[in-house]
Amino acid sequence: MNDSDRIKEKNENEILRRNFTKGSVKTILSISLLEHLCSTDLLAAKDKYTAKKWLHAVHEIGLGVKETKISQIQWQKQVEELFQNKIELNELLKLINFDQIEKSAKFVDNGARSIRPKLPRSNGYPKSLVFGSQVFALKKGRSVVPHGHNNMATAFIVLKGNFHGRHYDRISDEKDHMIIRPSIDDKFGPGQTSSISDEKDNVHWFKAEDEPAFIFNIHVLGLPNKKGPPRRTGRLYIDPEGEKLDNGLIRAPFIDSKKAHQKYG
């Protein structure tokens, strides 16, 4: 090989090395960008629903559980996915006209103020909804007091503020008591959600840790009771600081709304 050929080969190798380096850098940058998009949820944003699509989806799973096409636990899993992962919190706030709710909210010194939002019913939105809805407005230290539910499936999402949230599984009922077991004890901030049904996490209690604090709630009523004789749909107030039993169980006495708010409101 003469000097001319050696120089030519050296130049070709240098070009190949540079092209390989450029390709490697591009690949690394592409991978890094993809990792960044995933870590910042920019790709996940494509999976978010519009407010209209989201409301239809919540209505449809509500029909599903009402008509026993899906179980109550399946409804809980699906509704929590819709609340926490399928709509931006800002979109939900716009949907319920939260700015107006917050401006006009009249807080109470005990318990929570219940406000009924007006959801759209025209322009492609569901004309009627299988679920009811409300916003709870609370001062710091006030609570959605401990209570269980009959024939209901409900879901919550924190709109503003921070809460200490507790749930209990309803194991059985006695004449004057409900046997419960703690299932959730956690902090809940904006965008975080939980749910209840006759089958799972039936009792809940949320205490505001700052103010103003707001929770959005939906509820599907009149679900069939599969655990015993027919019972009236509604709330059942209890005192979760009842007698401690074996295996983490608590014998919680039934109390009325007044006593519940006196102690926990």
Where are these regions (language model features)?
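N-terminal secretory signal peptides
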Residues: 1-15
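N-terminal twin-arginine translocation
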Residues: 14-19, 30-50
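A short, N-terminal "cap"/entry segment at the start of jelly-roll beta-barrel domains
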Residues: 46-130, 182-185, 244-265
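Conserved short histidine dyad/triad with adjacent acidic residue
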Residues: 134-149, 198-201
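Glycine- and acidic-residue-biased ligand/ion/polar-headgroup-sensing regions
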Residues: 153-164
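A short hydrophobic beta-strand segment most commonly corresponding to one strand
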Residues: 155-157, 210-223
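Short acidic-glycine-tyrosine-enriched beta hairpin
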Residues: 172-201
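Asparagine-centered strand-capping/turn motif at beta-strand->loop junctions
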Residues: 205-208
